Amino acid sequence: MSSEILDQLESKIRQAVETIQLLQLEVEELKEKNDQAQQANDALRNENEQLKVEHNNWQERLRSLLGQIDNV
C-alpha cells in the first residue's frame, strides 16, 4: 500500500472515531432527556391519581348533601 492510501485510511478512521464519539455523547444526552421526561411523566401520573381521588371525594360529598336536601 502506498503512503497516500494509508493516509486516506487513517483520515477515514479518525473521522469514524470522531463520529462515534459524537454519537455517544448524543446518546447520553438523549438518555438524560428520556430520564427527565420519565420523571415528569411519573409526577403527572401521580398528580392525576390524586386529582381523581379528590374528584371522587367531592362527588361523594355532593351526593351526600343532595341526599340530605332530598330528605328535607
UniProtKB/Swiss-Prot annotation:
Keyword Cell division on entry: yes
Membrane-spanning intervals of the chain: none
Record has Cytoplasm as a keyword: yes
Gene3D superfamilies: 1.20.5.340
Subcellular location: Cytoplasm
Residue ranges that the Swiss-Prot or TrEMBL entry lists as coiled coil: 1-72
Pfam families given in the database record: ZapB
Gene Ontology biological process: division septum assembly; FtsZ-dependent cytokinesis
Keywords, in A-Z order: Cell cycle, Cell division, Coiled coil, Cytoplasm, Septation
Main localization, broad class: cytoplasm
InterPro entries referenced in this protein's UniProt entry, alphabetically: Cell_div_ZapB (IPR009252)
GO cellular component annotations of the record: cytoplasm
Entry's family note: Belongs to the ZapB family.
Functional note: Non-essential, abundant cell division factor that is required for proper Z-ring formation. It is recruited early to the divisome by direct interaction with FtsZ, stimulating Z-ring assembly and thereby promoting cell division earlier in the cell cycle. Its recruitment to the Z-ring requires functional FtsA or ZipA.
Quaternary structure and interacting proteins, as annotated: Homodimer. The ends of the coiled-coil dimer bind to each other, forming polymers. Interacts with FtsZ.
Protein name as annotated: Cell division protein ZapB
Gene source species: Actinobacillus succinogenes (strain ATCC 55618 / DSM 22257 / CCUG 43843 / 130Z)
